[in-house]
Amino acid sequence: MVLIRVLANLLILQLSYAQKSSELVTGGHPCNINEHPFLVLVYHDGYQCGGTLINEEWVLTAAHCDGKKMKLQFGLHSKNEPNKDKQTRVPKEKFFCLSSKNFIKWGKDIMLIRLNRPVNNSTHIAPLSLPSSPPSQNTVCNIMGWGTISPTKEIYPDVPHCANINILDHAVCRAFYPGLLEKSKTLCAGILQGGKDICQGDSGGPLICNGQVQGIVSVGGNPCAEPRVPAIYTKVFDHLDWIKSIIAGNTAATCPL
């Protein structure tokens, strides 16, 4: 039986923060240093997640990544040897579809963070575009993060790992995740034969399709990267009106039903 797990993992802070922390991409490869200028490291209270910079003042991540004393790192590649243009921010405001304590409402695991001050675009810092249309089945997409690179052991890399996976039919995910509705605002993605997957510490990170952020890492199987056990991603396209309304200043905007 597939256990549904929250993909945020314990982060052991040492010096700036520890290497044993996130959910890394399993079955991937080290990302190129210039491949992820939008990728954000989100950490707090011993936990680590990923996030996506969508403009100089706003970050998308998962609702279950919420916590006190949250910090966000931008322009990060190697944890041990940070880029000179790395920047750190804290949240000014956070917005949810649901309480961060009730995120397991399929498709509601989304958090929009307004930073305490804008980041400065640089060699290793730049936003990722929101989707112009939803991805179709079989689209090849990219996942990335500092999560564990082993499906059964906590082996955390110094640099984020990347992997290509496919958008799958929702029926594949519904077969393994009880309660997942046919029309839930989620994406089902992975590799049917297994071997590549998000894993512990990748929560909140992006699912990137055709150069746009299409999904937010939400939940997956345990262990990671098992055959025919894909992961579930919050579908960004279905939340576009809410995201754009919040950024425009309509903080009372409601999420899609």
From Swiss-Prot:
Sugar-modified residues: 120-121
GO biological process, one term: proteolysis
Cellular component, GO, one term: secretory granule
Signal peptide location: 1-18
Keyword Hydrolase: yes
SUPFAM superfamilies: Trypsin-like serine proteases
Tissue specificity comment: Expressed by the venom gland.
Similarity-based family: Belongs to the peptidase S1 family. Snake venom subfamily.
PROSITE patterns, alphabetized: TRYPSIN_DOM, TRYPSIN_HIS, TRYPSIN_SER
Function: Snake venom serine protease that may act in the hemostasis system of the prey.
Propeptide residue span(s): 19-24
Subcellular location, record wording: Secreted
Record's protein name: Snake venom serine protease KN11
Any Pfam family matching the protein: Trypsin
Disulfide bonds: 31-162, 49-65, 97-255, 141-209, 173-188, 199-224
Listed GO MF terms: serine-type endopeptidase activity; toxin activity
Keyword Magnesium listed: no
Keywords from the UniProt entry: Disulfide bond, Glycoprotein, Hemostasis impairing toxin, Hydrolase, Protease, Secreted, Serine protease, Signal, Toxin, Zymogen
The protein's Enzyme Commission number: 3.4.21.-
